[in-house]
């Protein structure tokens, strides 16, 4: 039994399939099956039960895998402690579509001559459920999840079940983004005022659920969203607070809705046992600085 084999076991548990784990690990299935059998014989327990859809851990197997994951995490901890390289820039993060987060990413790239270093960057935008799964699966080291404050317990249950560490970043109300040519620019805005406007929807955030009573377009590309806001005055978007610099660059106006306030919250997440690298810490610092600016 060695460390690498323990890591193989945790992959089998994650994918609930020997064949899928073998594909992910780039080894053949018979070899992986043999390793599992050897470990089961050495530990004198049955770790997995086979069935027609894959494998599931036995009761003893869950206990064994729990300890195996702790060992894997401790080894990863040691590796991360000495992995920082002043000549390399490593960052791996999954986030919601949000201008303040992308602004923090840009500020991070600009600090300490980061762009002169060898780059290994993975910045992915997606929804909260996919972010949780990506971080749990090890596809991303860091994640930012966003959800309504009223759903906090539901998401905490998922995060705890997947043994992810979470830290609150920011609580806010969604605001209305319009161009300076929008007729609502100088008015107090109420929900009824939006009925004659076109909502540009993006991501998995749904502020207005009455789809049949208001005009909307689903737009998932950030560049065209901003173009539409500028070119078609009677359009708007629900957005998280945005940096003033970005508003000024695009001639946008950010307005509050007087009769629609739904608090949302952003959380930073990562796997338990994962040690934040120097690059991770620098990005989080940039993130918190931008949050202070948009509050």
Language-model-derived ranges and their functions:
Residues 40-57:
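A short LG(V/I)-centered, amphipathic sequence patch enriched
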Residues 107-111, 128-174, 253-254:
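Short beta-strand-centered segments that line the small-molecule binding cleft or hinge
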Residues 101-107, 152, 184-216, 277:
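Secondary-structure junction motif
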Residues 10-28:
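Short helix-boundary/capping micro-motifs
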Residues 136-140, 204-255:
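Hydrophobic hinge/microswitch elements
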Residues 255-295:
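A late-sequence structural motif
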Residues 30, 85-133:
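N-terminal winged-helix
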Residues 158-199:
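Flexible hinge/capping segments at coil-to-helix
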């Amino acid at each position: 039994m060695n460390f690498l084999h323990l890591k193989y076991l945790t992959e089998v548990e994650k994918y609930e399939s020997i064949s899928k784990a073998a594909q992910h690990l780039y080894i053949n299935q018979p070899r992986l099956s043999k390793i599992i059998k050897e470990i089961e014989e050495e530990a004198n327990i049955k770790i997995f039960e086979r069935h027609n859809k894959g494998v599931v851990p036995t009761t003893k197997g869950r206990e064994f895998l729990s300890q195996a994951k702790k060992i894997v995490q401790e080894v990863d901890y040691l590796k991360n402690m000495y992995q920082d390289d002043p000549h390399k820039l490593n960052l791996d993060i999954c986030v919601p579509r949000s201008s303040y987060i992308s602004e923090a990413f840009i500020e991070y790239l600009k600090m300490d001559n980061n762009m002169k270093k060898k780059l290994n960057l993975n910045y992915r935008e997606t929804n909260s459920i996919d972010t949780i799964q990506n971080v749990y699966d090890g596809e991303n080291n860091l994640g930012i999840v966003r959800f309504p404050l009223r759903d906090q317990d539901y998401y905490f249950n998922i995060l705890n079940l997947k043994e992810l560490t979470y830290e609150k970043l920011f609580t806010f109300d969604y605001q209305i983004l319009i161009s300076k040519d929008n007729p609502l620019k100088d008015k107090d805005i109420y929900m009824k005022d939006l009925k004659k406007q076109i909502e540009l929807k993006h991501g998995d955030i749904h502020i207005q659920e009455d789809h049949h009573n208001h005009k909307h377009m689903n737009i998932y590309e950030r560049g065209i969203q901003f173009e539409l806001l500028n070119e078609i005055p009677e359009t708007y978007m629900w957005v998280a607070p945005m940096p003033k610099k970005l508003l000024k660059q695009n001639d946008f106006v950010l307005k509050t809705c007087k009769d629609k306030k739904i608090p949302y919250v952003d959380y930073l997440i990562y796997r338990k046992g994962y040690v934040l690298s120097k690059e991770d810490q620098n990005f989080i610092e940039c993130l918190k600085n931008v949050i202070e600016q948009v509050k």
